[in-house]
């Protein structure tokens, strides 16, 4: 038994010895390559080959070597450099680096670099040292220094260690800037010291350049410092204005205004104030100023000196030198602007003064100064007549006017001739009709009280000639140059002596220029009077007067025709007959007498009847005879036929038919109504009063005028009855009945006396109704 146990121990020792004994057999390199290749093929082994392929290493061992390189390089290793050092492909290094960064939170992979926490702590210490030295630092500077991304530096380095390794604080307005409290205190001290030393406005950029403080820090700390001044803005060109300077400005402006009562914009701008007007308003809120282009005048200066002096100048009928009462600093332009502004504000009547080179003349003074020029105008007018100068001027103007008329006739030939239409209408035998389409050219007014004015030489002829020359096809005609009888030099000679006594002779030409046209017109008017007084002009005056008279009567007939068309046909026919027997007969008489004068026939009675005119026409020359006879016949026909016959007579007499200006119809009707109202106020005869009242009411209600005799009063009252209320109709009807009663009764009878008393009592009511009735009343009654 014991021997067996010993045998077992011996065998165990041999076995242990066999186990502990290693084989000393060595494999060749070829065998090793084959073994490794076999293991790789069977995916039993993973290795990483070097770039030259001579060596290979396991990924785990390569990972340990990368970590060793990170440690050797101080916690920051560039993967490109690691790839070169380990002689391994960069892609393999990058894969393992990503795994290292993912597995180890203390290691970061940043832009192809491995960085561990030790390195981050190291650069945090460097940043802290730099922050202590400079007081302020930005992430952009650190990114440039450490060649690391700004986001990584801000979040993983600075903000992570802020308050621990890095002793500072983050700028609230700019998170990428960090500074120390000591730096802020230094900046405050610099800003406070710089601003305290400034006594005049200075650009903020200059201040920052001198003290070396950033602009954003300057503006953020300015309110905390509470400086003795203010910054104009936060823009790049802002300025700092100390309170002492603003006070100095205000004191200077107040002192200057107190002494002079005005302020110059240039002087204020030299103080550094850009908007002078706004500054003046702000500095003197309770003062009123007259703001001119160059200066601002105090309202007290204007009121107490200039306005008062102008009023005195007007009262004394003298002149005023404004330079003697205004500050000497003001230029001539300033003084003229002061005067113009005062006149615009209606402190005085502008028409009472004339301003010339700082001198204000009252109109009475100038009127007295140029009084001798009246005699000059008279003498020049006589000289123009005696020398034939004015007569030549009249001839040239007349020729120019005739040329203009010819041009108008040529233009009218191209238009539709409405007179042909009127001839067709007249041939149909209809009574009534109008003057539409008739060629007219007149400033027509009511028939009454216009004959005398029409006989005068038309002062508008010259203007008509010029307008016609400019406006139509008469381009070859030239306007007559105005005749200059009184010249500026003539007036200068007369007024220079008086002005020399006042030392104002340098203003003689400007004053003369003001009155040259006035006295020239006076001389022309006087020459016209002298010219019209000469025998050779009588014939021309007669022709012009007759022409205007006939045109005026034709316009009256046209307007009356519109009114009578509002009546029934039977009444209308009677009104047409009355119109032709009155105004038509007057036209026939005027033309017959004119033709008789042209034919050198003597007519004793100027109020001709139809037979007398026919007899006179037979004695006239052949060119007039047929036209006059036809016109006489037309008196018993329609208005259109009479107008056509009248136009024929006018053409044979070389008279112009003026065009219709319907725009003036309303004015003519209003003028006619005013004349009727004036006659009504002066009338005391009941029948005539009723007649006038009826015509006025008809014009007011219809907007047309009517030529009717007293026998048509009842028809007129019947026509306007619908536009009046019951009380008004009753008044007119009662008055009409009383008038008939008076006319039918014996003048001395009791019936006539009683009717007259009633008429006298009702007269005021009838007059008031006619005078005060309006279109508004018409609408209300309707």
Swiss-Prot record:
User: Any keyword tRNA processing?
Assistant: no
GO MF terms here are: UFM1 ligase activity
Query: Does the keyword section mention Transferase?
Result: yes
- This protein is called E3 UFM1-protein ligase 1 homolog
Q: What does this protein do?
A: E3 UFM1-protein ligase that mediates ufmylation of target proteins.
An example Gene Ontology cellular component term from the record?
endoplasmic reticulum membrane
Q: Which PANTHER family match?
A: E3 UFM1-PROTEIN LIGASE 1 (PTHR31057:SF0)
Q: What is its EC number?
A: 2.3.2.-
Top-level taxonomic group: Eukaryota
Ranges for the region named Disordered are: 405-478
């Amino acid at each position: 038994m014991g021997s067996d146990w010993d045998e077992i121990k011996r065998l165990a020792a041999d076995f242990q010895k066999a186990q502990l004994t290693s084989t000393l057999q060595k494999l060749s390199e070829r065998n090793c390559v084959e073994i490794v290749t076999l293991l790789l093929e069977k995916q039993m082994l993973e290795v990483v080959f070097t770039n030259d392929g001579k060596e290979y290493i396991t990924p785990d061992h390569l990972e340990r070597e990368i970590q060793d390189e990170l440690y050797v390089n101080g916690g920051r290793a560039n993967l490109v450099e690691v790839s070169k050092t380990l002689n391994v492909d960069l892609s393999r290094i990058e894969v393992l680096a990503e795994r290292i960064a993912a597995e180890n939170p203390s290691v970061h992979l940043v832009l192809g670099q491995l960085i561990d926490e030790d390195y981050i702590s190291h650069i945090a210490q460097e940043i802290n040292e730099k922050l202590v030295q400079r007081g302020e630092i930005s992430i952009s500077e650190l990114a440039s220094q450490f060649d690391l991304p700004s986001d990584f530096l801000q979040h993983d380095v600075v903000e992570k260690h802020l308050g621990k390794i890095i002793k500072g604080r983050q700028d609230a307005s700019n998170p990428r800037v960090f500074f120390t409290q000591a730096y802020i205190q230094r900046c405050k001290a610099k800003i406070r010291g710089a601003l305290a030393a400034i006594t005049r406005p200075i650009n903020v950029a200059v201040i920052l350049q001198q003290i070396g403080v950033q602009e954003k820090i300057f503006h953020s700390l300015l309110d905390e410092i509470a400086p003795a001044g203010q910054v104009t803005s936060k823009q790049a060109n802002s300025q700092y204005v100390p309170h002492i300077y603003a006070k100095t400005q205000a004191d200077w402006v107040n002192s200057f205004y107190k002494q002079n009562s005005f302020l110059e914009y240039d002087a204020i701008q030299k103080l550094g104030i850009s908007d002078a007007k706004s500054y003046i308003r702000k500095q003197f809120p309770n003062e009123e100023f007259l703001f001119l282009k160059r200066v601002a005048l105090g309202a007290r200066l204007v009121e107490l000196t200039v306005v008062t002096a102008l009023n005195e100048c007007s009262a004394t009928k003298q002149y005023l030198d404004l330079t003697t009462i205004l500050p000497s600093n003001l230029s001539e332009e300033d003084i003229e602007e002061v005067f113009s502004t005062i006149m615009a504000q209606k402190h005085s009547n502008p028409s009472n003064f004339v301003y010339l080179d700082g001198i204000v003349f009252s109109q009475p003074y100038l009127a007295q100064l140029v009084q001798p020029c009246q005699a000059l105008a008279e003498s020049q007018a006589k000289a123009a007549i005696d020398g034939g100068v004015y007569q030549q001027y009249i001839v040239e103007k007349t020729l120019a006017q005739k040329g203009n008329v010819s041009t108008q006739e040529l233009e009218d030939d191209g238009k539709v001739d409405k007179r042909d239409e009127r001839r067709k209408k007249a041939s149909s035998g209809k009574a009534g009709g109008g003057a539409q389409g008739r060629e007219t050219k007149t400033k027509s007014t009511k028939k009454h009280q216009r004959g005398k004015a029409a006989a005068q030489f038309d002062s508008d002829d010259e203007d008509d000639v010029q307008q016609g020359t400019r406006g139509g096809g008469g381009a070859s005609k030239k306007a007559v140059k105005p005749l200059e009888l009184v010249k500026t030099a003539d007036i200068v000679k007369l007024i220079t002596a008086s002005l020399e006594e006042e030392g104002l002779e340098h203003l003689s030409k400007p004053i003369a220029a003001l009155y040259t046209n006035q006295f020239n017109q006076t001389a022309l008017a006087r020459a016209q009077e002298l010219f019209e007084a000469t025998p050779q002009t009588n014939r021309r005056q007669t022709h012009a007067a007759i022409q205007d008279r006939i045109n005026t009567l034709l316009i009256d007939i046209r307007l009356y025709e519109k009114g009578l068309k509002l009546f029934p046909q039977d009444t209308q026919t009677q009104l047409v007959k009355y119109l032709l027997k009155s105004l038509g007969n007057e036209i026939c008489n005027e033309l017959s007498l004119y033709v008789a004068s042209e034919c050198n026939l003597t007519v004793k009675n100027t109020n001709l009847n139809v037979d007398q005119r026919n007899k006179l026409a037979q004695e006239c020359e052949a060119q007039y005879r047929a036209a006059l006879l036809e016109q006489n016949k037309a008196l018993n026909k329609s208005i259109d036929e009479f107008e056509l016959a009248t136009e024929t007579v006018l053409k044979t007499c070389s008279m112009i038919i003026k065009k219709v200006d319907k725009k003036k119809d309303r004015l003519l009707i209003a003028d006619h109504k005013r004349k009727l109202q004036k006659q009504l106020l002066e009338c005391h005869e009941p029948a005539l009063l009723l007649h006038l009242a009826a015509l006025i009411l008809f014009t007011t209600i219809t907007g047309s005028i009517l030529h009717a005799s007293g026998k048509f009063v009842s028809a007129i009252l019947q026509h306007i009855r619908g536009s009046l209320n019951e009380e008004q109709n009753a008044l007119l009807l009662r008055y009409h009945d009383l008038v008939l009663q008076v006319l039918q009764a014996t003048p001395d009878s009791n019936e006539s006396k009683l009717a007259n008393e009633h008429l006298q009592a009702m007269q005021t009511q009838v007059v008031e109704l006619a005078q005060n009735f309006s279109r508004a009343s018409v609408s209300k009654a309707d």
